[in-house]
Amino acid sequence: MAIATPTSAAPTPAPAGFTGTLTDKLREQFAEGLDGQTLRPDFTMEQPVHRYTAADHATWRTLYDRQEALLPGRACDEFLQGLSTLGMSREGVPSFDRLNETLMRATGWQIVAVPGLVPDEVFFEHLANRRFPASWWMRRPDQLDYLQEPDGFHDIFGHVPLLINPVFADYMQAYGQGGLKAARLGALDMLARLYWYTVEFGLIRTPAGLRIYGAGIVSSKSESVYALDSASPNRIGFDVHRIMRTRYRIDTFQKTYFVIDSFEQLFDATRPDFTPLYEALGTLPTFGAGDVVDGDAVLNAGTREGWADTADI
């Protein structure tokens, strides 16, 4: 989803009719000639494999090697199995077409290349039709540990392996379908929180202990350690009502992680019609990202050490 904020208000060489969030990376691509002929109405484009540089492939290898060494025993088995099934490797930025051959056979999903963040309704439309929009470009070598918007490593390494799992794949499609409805009902803030605390930063309980499944964690060296090992954050049992009222942080480690018991639990949470829930929750105050409230199934209350004081989203 579109979570980054627009950059400066300088003139932008965007194609006529462009309605997306103008981030630095999009401005850069428009300035380099990305136009309405290259960029389709649904914001997709051909993966420009000819534009990957040696530095791009080296960055992929560096990031891949770090996570490959770190994630066994931290990432959930379903993620690791998906990574193996897709045949993703350290060799360089993968071909989306090659990954799609395996992905389509497994769950009917496909990756579509996009230049960056896309408008919410476009994003939901893709998910509802089992298409995952992935940024084609790679972060710079000086951005290995943080960048403002998701790049190809975050989107492909972080998100795509779980799309091999049938239950998670169904959840993502249901989320897209729900997003289209939420947009009409003015409830995108609540649904965005569900995405953030599950797809991006979710943990899962397993017989071997807590494991990571959120893409924002599995694609990050430092948060892969922090999410499981640090005493600072809260870890709270999954509750869709609670999550939809909980604000979040985009610029630092999470103050709270929500823990599911299974992907089936996650999928089942999307089955009901959310319309009455939106109406009920819309009248209630939101919670801060680090709040622990009555009724929480608290696995551990964080020490709050190192928490930033600036505002949540």
UniProtKB/Swiss-Prot annotation:
Pfam families: Biopterin_H. InterPro entries: ArAA_hydroxylase (IPR001273), ArAA_hydroxylase_Fe/CU_BS (IPR018301), ArAA_hydroxylase_sf (IPR036951), Aro-AA_hydroxylase_C_sf (IPR036329), Aromatic-AA_hydroxylase_C (IPR019774), Phe-4-hydroxylase_mono (IPR005960). One of its GO terms (molecular function) is phenylalanine 4-monooxygenase activity. Its EC number is 1.14.16.1. One of its GO terms (biological process) is L-phenylalanine catabolic process. Its cofactor is Fe(2+). Fe cation binds at H154, H159, E200. This is Phenylalanine-4-hydroxylase. It comes from Ralstonia nicotianae (strain ATCC BAA-1114 / GMI1000) (Ralstonia solanacearum). The lineage of its organism: Bacteria, Pseudomonadati, Pseudomonadota, Betaproteobacteria, Burkholderiales. The gene is phhA.
